[in-house]
């Protein structure tokens, strides 16, 4: 009964280089066991990158858009809490280097590993990917929740 089925604990190996941003209501804890990683986030209306070095731990507050980037031969531990049945995760792409949403999908997440792939494939087959412009069905006008992009300290 180490965590009473309340946590997801998993190792992630590199490489992992993507353009999508994950939106989760709960906190995520990152620990780099081998190598370094970059964690681009959207905070205070602009993109910043948190560098997590080998041996470092970083707690990302909930509702912060983030895009973990790992190089080859890196290993990191990630701890997330189990989602409540009422919670929804999001996957979002932005227009170029702007904070304008290009494409997003919201879903209940019980297995991020298997549930991300269909959303990513949908994006790469989309008109939004082809044109780089948001389309009428690419953004939820009434998202389940609004990302909180202001709760990460500025010294990261």
Model feature map: region roles:
Residues 1-57, 65-156:
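Jelly-roll (double-stranded beta-helix
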